[in-house]
Amino acid sequence: AAIPQLKTDPSKLSILIKSGVLSTRLTTSLAFEYNYTLQVLLLDYSGHPDAVMLPIVMWRRQHQPDLLDNPDRQTKAVRFEADFLTATTVDLAIELDLTENVFTRPRPGVGGGMDVIHKAEPVHPSVQPFSEEWSLWFRDELLAQWNHDPRP
């Protein structure tokens, strides 16, 4: 976990799909697209909001760059609400509008068989890959850090 508080207590994080739509067209292949709202809930969160939002921005740049390119969607694709519990803690709800393309192709050697492929988003020309290790600081406070495998 990039966020230290969630590394200590992962039960404070809940992720669910709030609503979804399956889009498909009558074509020769069985391709479709998931369109859904992912809801991320952080309970009793006492950290800096940037420690949550920056990893989301980083993830979106790599995995949903089309949302950042579309002026109609870029300002609405991530929404959030905070319920202040105390002077230092909140329940933070974040909603992300996401898409995922799914394709099929005939499976070699299996009559009538198909392989399902969840295609990765193409790399946007303006997106530079992030380093495998990064940290986020606000003044002298470490807000978040992450070591990740850069392979798609």
Residue ranges and their predicted role:
Residues 20, 47, 109-113:
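Residue-identity detector for glycine
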